Swiss-Prot record:
It comes from the Bacteria. Pfam families: Cpn60_TCP1. Its EC number is 5.6.1.7. The gene is groEL. NCBIfam families: GroEL, PRK00013.1, PRK12849.1, PRK12850.1, PRK12851.1. GO terms for biological process: protein refolding. Forms a cylinder of 14 subunits composed of two heptameric rings stacked back-to-back. Interacts with the co-chaperonin GroES. Keywords: ATP-binding, Chaperone, Cytoplasm, Isomerase, Nucleotide-binding. The keyword Chaperone applies. ATP binds at residues 30-33, 51, 87-91, 415, 479-481, 495. Belongs to the chaperonin (HSP60) family. This is Chaperonin GroEL.
Amino acid sequence: MAAKQVLFADEARVRIVRGVNVLANAVKTTLGPKGRNVVLERSFGAPTVTKDGVSVAKEIELKDKFENIGAQLVKDVASKTSDNAGDGTTTATVLAQAVVQEGLKYVAAGFNPIDLKRGIDKAVAAAVEELKKLSKPVTTSKEIAQVGSISANSDASIGQIIADAMDKVGKEGVITVEDGKSLENELDVVEGMQFDRGYLSPYFINSPEKQVAALDDPYVLIYDKKVSNIRDLLPVLEQVAKSSRPLLIIAEDVEGEALATLVVNNIRGILKTTAVKAPGFGDRRKAMLEDIAILTGGTVISEETGMSLEKATLQDLGQAKRIEVAKENTTIIDGAGDGKSIEARVKQIRAQIEEATSDYDREKLQERVAKLAGGVAVIRVGAATEVEMKEKKARVEDALHATRAAVEEGVVPGGGVALLRAKQAITGLKGDTADQNAGIKLILRAVEEPLRTIVTNAGDEASVVVNTVLNGKGNYGYNAATGEYGDLVEQGVLDPTKVTRTALQNAASVASLLLTAEAAVVELMEDKPAAAPAMPGGMGGMGGMDF
């Protein structure tokens, strides 16, 4: 086991706080509409330029191991806030630094760290309640655009494209962000349900200019096993042929004789069919087939439920207004499913989302809800260079998370004002001891820090602005983008309540843990022996030896 180095009390805290300050000072330069960029070196390729707090935090690793403890703890604040709320990482970092710095003064003056922590917890709980009272729901597309713009560092075009996407697919719809091919941001919306499986044979294509198999008013056969014998399919094919409507077959696979017969029938115009593989794998495949069945008003033909392909009738088949099958995906438009059944299915999946433990499962379940309830929107981010593209894409993703948080819990006035207004709830608080009162006082000072940082980054005098805003009421605050005071909600300077709340809770949680630490243990750096000198070229002096 490697040897350890241990530091105690103030000696440990001072070193740890030094690390907190290094990371926080790098991150907080990005806060506000006039925040600066940070350039991150990459081990290969071009450097990355970013204004995203969590991206900066994740890159920082300090040489001094005690300082690194502080940096990593604050990095955890940023990451947790990003995971929970999707934004507010810089605000959380600034708050954590403020609580640590103020708290350290009290600890050095002999206050009890445990009581300080209790006071901090009381003050934060009161501030969170006040934030909830200040919060107002987001109802209009304009408000969604404003929240997105603020989160994307005052880029109105990003806010607008996110608002447009939410208009098209609904607030529950899936919105994904991808690299674009042009200089402009683009929005693509897929109406209906789309899954990532295409036609099994190019001979199914009937629209050469779009390279798709387009089926109007088709039947949909959904089967959970492989189809290789055409005899199994014949009864249902004959019934569909009599109706003179096209047929889409979704099965685990269609191969051999069955596929060949379908292709020949299609080419000769006897029966217009297309076959695709079922989406997903394992249990997820079963669930997705069930989704498709409910959307189209059909039934999954499965041996598990006592059904067989030979006995399938037209009543077991789903229907849709139109289906387009491309090389790599299939889109079902306007399925004939019953509205109440679809609603019940969506409700069932939402219940599964609540219980899901992994992010991956949750994401896949949300995708299924969107495909049933709304649609899928793709924002393609355009930029001139790859470096700009990465930076812009990160901002779009941040803005998207922020707008989702705003829809979930509402919005409060931005620009650090909501935290200042929360001071009135903290001011009247009394702790059980003088040390707890010190913890409450500490939060009163810390909640000013985000506004101070925004103002400093904008090149103005922080103390003057903070006092002016405190003398105002409600939404009155300082708009750093214009350098003017006014009603921030009217001016569109909004923050999601969830983001502000999460930032404060996470910052106070980690910072108060740091203040109660009395010892720090790190691994000693091993002194590596100097590398052996290189052997001289050739084996001099060995010539003349007889072998």
